[in-house]
Amino acid sequence: MPEGLNIRRNTAILAAVLAIYVAVLSLAAAVLSLTFVLVTGFRSLLGLGPAIYLAAAALSALPVGRAMDRFGRVPVIATGFVLGSLGCVVTAAGTHWDSAVAVIAGFLLLGVSGSVTLLIRTAAGDMYPPERRARGISLVLFGSVFGAILGPALFGPLFSDKDVAASTLTVPWLAAAGMSLVACAVVLTVRPDPKLIAERISVGRDEVAPATAAPLSEIVRRPGVLPAMLAAIASFGVMVSVMNLTGYVVVDHHHHAQGSVFPIIGAHVLGMYALVLVIGRLIDRIGRGPALGGGLAVMAVSCIALTWVESVPLIAVLLFGLGLGWNLSFVSATAQLADATSPAERGKLLGLNDLVAGLTGASLALLGGIALDVLGVTALAIGATLLALAPAIFLARLRPAPQAAG
């Protein structure tokens, strides 16, 4: 590993940034559907709120990835947090004045910000060689554990003893705006840019980078790329659709207090990240392939159990399992996609992956909301289970892809 690259320092900073982002995400996951329904009154389209957010994230992912490859990781990530802060302010205004237009505009800005922050894993993958890449990504993602604790601790009290009304959401959204600006300031201290670190590592390993980045049509045909994308798309789509509808299920279907959503979402985010250091080492040891399908299988088990569970503690356990399965599948997919690309190609491939994954998640959130309203929780749980299980079975039948050397 070349000297003087501040890899440990940059890893710690990116982990801190993710902690702040995940704290904000815990609010969004808990109240996106609720915010949309309370402001618009469209209960039958409760999945439209998360769908707007996810569609904006998806459609901006590929341009964001290309921008990262051109301008570097840090400037783009910082811009994303500024947009996120603005989105929170606009959403807060919408809840205060009961403006559906403002809420939708805020969700769009939050979605663009979400696509940027999700691509922080590009920077994480940049800073480590292939044999340590899953662990390196895991070290950055571990910061999210603290965000899972911070989010409910900060936002939960803001909902205590409050009626379920749009006006009770204004202050939490404003608090999230301030946190996003803090994250922007923190990420600007990352030096050198992780893309430059990746280039230095390639030179140090005597790897010759291509003169120009290959087109996406060529990159996706490389060994292991499509299976990794399938796992990432399925795991992300199932995870975000179930996660974003959980708040409405808990409050409206199971008739729990609004504040009870935050421990559940906190448990889910802990599942996503609490064991990430162990998961990273496990993936590097057992290989990317088994981890891709194994994570989806864990998600399927967690989803089907939602059919019978109504209590807050048990729902929290199942959402923890959903997050854990996503962690296993998504980290291994990210590592495999990073293995298959040079530093100049990595951002756009992960951006393409996030484009398809985000559109899948948006579609599933919208369809899941309709299924939930018309057919109930059982239909949502069975549908999510099948969507996780089918690709897991397909991936189990594939021969493992060779691990790239660069």
Model-derived features with residue positions:
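C-terminal ends and interior cores of transmembrane alpha-helices
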Residues: 82-96, 298-310
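Juxtamembrane intracellular "pre-TM" segments in multi-pass secondary transporters
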Residues: 1-8, 192-229
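C-terminal membrane-cytosol helix-exit motif in multi-pass small-molecule transporters
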Residues: 177-202, 393-399
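Helix-loop-helix hairpin linking two adjacent transmembrane segments in secondary transporters
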Residues: 102, 130, 140-189
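Helix-to-loop junctions at the C-terminal end of transmembrane segments
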Residues: 60-72, 275-287, 372
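Hydrophobic core of transmembrane alpha-helices in multi-pass small-molecule transporters
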Residues: 19, 100-115, 314-328
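Short amphipathic helix-loop junctions that connect adjacent transmembrane helices
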Residues: 31-43, 244-259
